[in-house]
């Protein structure tokens, strides 16, 4: 399967946020000296009176955003995922998650595909850092169209904090323009009966390509887009696992405490099922271009196909 268009989720974030700024005067945007890289510079150009550059002071940015939220505003905070969920974690826990303050944390440059910046900037633990926090919701859009829908959703969502995970590198657009994002819902993108591939972020497009190749080998893989990681769509995932009996998870994240762990927790309690997790296995990232890094860590189409066949081999004894 070849996708005609690639777009960066951070690019559509900046455009959508600026558009929403014209519709909702309560939206304010804060960044930690990275407006250009996070594309919040687009909002800043159109709404300079509601844009705040907090400098390289991420914890202060989170605290200020919480204050805005408690004063009736709808704050978005943006920086790289490494800094948003690493440097600012304590502040997120204390003044955002604990009091259930509706702050929208939209982090860019998540995962391996930061590329040449290397391990210091490749945040592979952010889903885990956010998933462990009570009251925190997590969205990892599968493409630019879903990212735009997710941003529109969180702009109007006032029932607690949300973490939205975006990437630096452009990746395939898999949805049509009319796609509607549904919070808390997983999406069956390809039907199958032999194995379930549950993926998030850019790994969804990889899963769809793997689905086509596996079909040629006589393997019917069901592809599930799990863009809402917390809350998890238990019903859809359980139904798919019950149908196929084997699950492969795919994420551009550590396999510990990410999407794979969340699905393992669900299945171990409700429907014991063989799960093979595809992701970064207890390693740090390294410098390199995006495609080379994905291949090196087994997150390309070939790697996912191999993992899927391995899962089926284990399941069949």
Please identify what each model-predicted range represents.
Residues 1-165, 170, 180, ...:
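Thiamine diphosphate
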């Amino acid at each position: 399967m070849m996708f005609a268009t690639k777009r960066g989720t951070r690019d559509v974030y900046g455009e959508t946020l600026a558009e929403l700024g014209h519709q909702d005067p309560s939206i304010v945007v804060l960044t930690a000296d990275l407006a250009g890289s996070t594309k919040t510079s687009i909002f800043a150009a159109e709404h300079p009176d509601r844009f705040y550059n907090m400098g390289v002071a991420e914890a202060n940015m989170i605290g200020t955003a919480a204050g805005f939220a408690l004063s009736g505003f709808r704050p978005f905070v943006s920086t790289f995922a490494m800094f948003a969920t690493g440097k600012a974690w304590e502040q997120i826990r204390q003044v955002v998650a604990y009091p259930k303050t509706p702050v929208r944390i939209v982090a860019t440059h998540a995962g391996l595909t930061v590329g040449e910046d290397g391990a210091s900037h490749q945040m592979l633990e952010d889903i885990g850092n956010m998933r462990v926090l009570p009251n925190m919701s997590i969205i990892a859009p599968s493409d630019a169209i879903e990212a735009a829908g997710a941003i529109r959703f969180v702009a109007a969502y006032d029932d607690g904090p949300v973490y939205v995970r975006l990437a630096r590198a452009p990746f395939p657009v898999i949805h049509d323009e009319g796609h509607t994002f549904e919070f808390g819902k997983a999406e069956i993108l390809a039907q199958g009966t032999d194995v379930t591939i549950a993926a998030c972020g850019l790994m969804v497009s990889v899963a769809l390509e793997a689905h086509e190749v596996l079909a040629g080998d006589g393997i019917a893989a069901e592809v599930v887009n799990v863009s809402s990681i917390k809350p998890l769509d238990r019903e859809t995932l359980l139904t798919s696992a019950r149908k196929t009996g084997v699950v492969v998870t795919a994420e551009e994240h550590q396999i510990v405490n990410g999407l794979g762990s969340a699905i393992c927790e669900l299945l171990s309690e409700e429907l014991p099922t063989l799960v093979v997790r595809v992701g970064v296995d207890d390693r740090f990232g390294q410098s390199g271009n995006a495609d080379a890094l994905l291949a090196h860590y087994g997150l390309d189409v070939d790697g996912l196909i191999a993992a899927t066949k391995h899962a089926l081999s284990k399941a069949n004894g």
